[in-house]
């Protein structure tokens, strides 16, 4: 064989690996493009409206349970409550949506823990891609089913939303865990093995920002189309459900390219999947009579692995700092969106079309924030990652502060509809920047080979706060029947997060993560 032939073969293999690395990143973009409208459009706008709408249709006046909520009898200022479980308990119609959010996140947390351990154990990028598609299909079909409910099926609405949100949680964790793997593989292919560690930081930030912007771009397209769909159904009770149907179809269709794009990051050795997984099993030798995998053990491994990861995280100072800060931040940022939608509908009496327009403004500015903050502002002013997060939080804290002003002034402080449009721009910029920066920061301080499990910790921290936040706001609204009081809660949380974030050192965290990955037991590392 001539040297020319050998060089041609080497070049062919190199080109193959580069193309595969590029396809993996494209597949990662497809994950964001397909699923982001669910959380940005459905969860943030349509589902809260549907839950409140169904609750109002089935609710009664708070001071007289014999009068239906939508009855013209009584004062327009009368608040409404919904009777649950044969009227054993009554909750505010706005609180009902918040309680369902809390329950959905609890279910999401349980399923994320169970699945993430299996994904890390299997260690195959292609398997992670299958997980993205499988759970995406179930989530998309559940979303489509929501659009077919009638307004008396309030428990079915809650149940389908819980399933869909649980599926989104899984693909969110698995998708985020693929980011550092794809970044490092891309750098290895481009430099043919060796690469500078500093390039990981910059490329991770760029790809994460592009992914976030693509996700918001898809959400923007969905919202614009939804505006026309809702306008065509103006005056109909099914106007919101038509928009939900479109979200479900979008999710289902655009995730399909991942089937062909996402593949293993290296040329794989031909090993049967069950053999590979068996070699990684935390319970070696425990298989059924047919020699197949014992899935009970694999499901429990997710919990065992998470417990071990929390033990490892205790050794990683900056991981713990980040998780504590993120618990506080997420409790406020994620809850404030759904609360604002409920507030706009209940207190400002905004139409569905107006709320979709607000959502469009939020999405457009989130796209700008995802690009401008990490790639331009942070670079121009030479902010560290932790400093960037702190400035975003300070920016976002103005939103609840402005809502609090409404207790003291009649002319402003979320007293008029136009104020919601202005705050949508403000909120969108902070949300986009936070989405891009937070993912990239955390991906830099997790031990290599434990991405899925540590991102499940990130998600559990996020979701744990999302269980607590809506639940507490729901209790507050039940007590006061005035959702404006929740702005005090949000502002306090954002202020509390600042001193915690001030302690974060990303360089130190990355160094500690690399050191920990070297001392992890062999059974806990991903096989390359």
Swiss-Prot record:
Pfam families: ATG22
Subcellular location: Vacuole membrane
Keyword entries, A-Z: Amino-acid transport, Autophagy, Membrane, Phosphoprotein, Transmembrane, Transmembrane helix, Transport, Vacuole
Cytoplasmic side: 1-98, 152-153, 232-241, 340-352, 410-417, 507-528
Lineage: superkingdom: Eukaryota
Vacuolar topological domain residue ranges: 120-130, 175-210, 263-318, 374-388, 439-485
Residues with PTM Phosphoserine: 278
Membrane topology field: Multi-pass membrane protein
GO BP terms, alphabetized: amino acid transmembrane export from vacuole; autophagy
Transmembrane parts of this sequence: 99-119, 131-151, 154-174, 211-231, 242-262, 319-339, 353-373, 389-409, 418-438, 486-506
InterPro entries according to UniProt: Atg22, Atg22-like, ATG22/LtaA_families, MFS_trans_sf
Family assignment from sequence similarity: Belongs to the ATG22 family.
UniProt function note: Vacuolar effluxer which mediate the efflux of leucine and other amino acids resulting from autophagic degradation. The release of autophagic amino acids allows the maintenance of protein synthesis and viability during nitrogen starvation.
Protein name: Autophagy-related protein 22
Lineage: Eukaryota, Fungi, Dikarya, Ascomycota, Saccharomycotina
